[in-house]
């Protein structure tokens, strides 16, 4: 006999067919039915959304957790608590900034062991494609990573080397042989080196100096090279954290299998507004001008950009000290990404369904997370109850990641996550977390 374990009922439920009244029936952590609003069996626990919207949990495929090895920066306990508070139900952890980086099967096992019992949301893992491990990527693929990250410029940490363009082609061919996914930090070093030499004694504390040191040409040339490698090998390839809108022109190379993401900070801030010395805004690629920002929004509108993810890359406060060239480049934003994007999207006439497409569905499709990203029968019951119109200013002391450093401090954001559910289990509600972490560690092919 059919029987749901828990029901979620709301007047505004975001499904692939649009926003509708519905009652979502959950059995064994999966969505069994998306039923009419009044289809409510008796004696089954019922979560009433009221005026809140129910939508599929955010899938953030670009998170640096840094554990093991740099746990003073972040860790699985704090990163996944922050994720849950931000409506994120699945994260994929990047292979670098942990020690060791996830470039071998042994390193993957060590990272999974470090995460065991600490995950408040589901966690999967990317592998790394670095020069020393080319030729052995199939082993890491078979161990369950969702794809392979590489850099075409220095990564910022010594233990994760970058690839030359010839090595990029070799990695793409190797990954294409097992239909894997290559994800790329797409900046090449030569334009950066030339621009840096031209700066001479320009003020290193001025944001315009840092911006000039990483010109759009570095991204555009890298994306062209990545598209060429994809077309030559048939490798599925994804461009990470697109900043320069000019790079979009090179994605449509015939024969290339390409996708691209951008991040909340590129959709929110503009170079003209960043004060000198404000290194909390430093990231790579850099935040560019307002005109460029609006071109990224147009690419979201027409579908050329398929995903918006956080690139959560935290560090301790002391590492943000000094000039823009001394400070660590990265932002801690996994908890804020949903509200940031909703705030900016609604101001430009987008609907919440658009945000769900960019932040839940799109990342899940790109990473091959077949059970995630949509309120559909058979998917995991990863759900968020969201208040659209309630807003608040960001107080860094109230955030849940390890170090309260954020460029969003004092900024007013729309929306509020009221509750987050992973496979139908409440992991966050009204500022409180489940005592026992309910997240699982995911492997490619079983998620």
Kindly give the residue locations of the regions a language model identified.
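Divalent metal-coordination and catalytic microenvironments
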Residues: 11, 24, 29, 51, ...
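Active-site loop-to-helix "anion-binding N-cap" substructures in soluble metabolic enzymes
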Residues: 68, 94-120, 126-133, 150-158, ...
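Histidine/acidic residue-rich metal-binding segments in metalloenzymes
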Residues: 135-150, 154-308
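His/Asp/Glu-enriched, well-ordered alpha-helical/loop segment
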Residues: 204-225, 229-234, 280, 301-308, ...
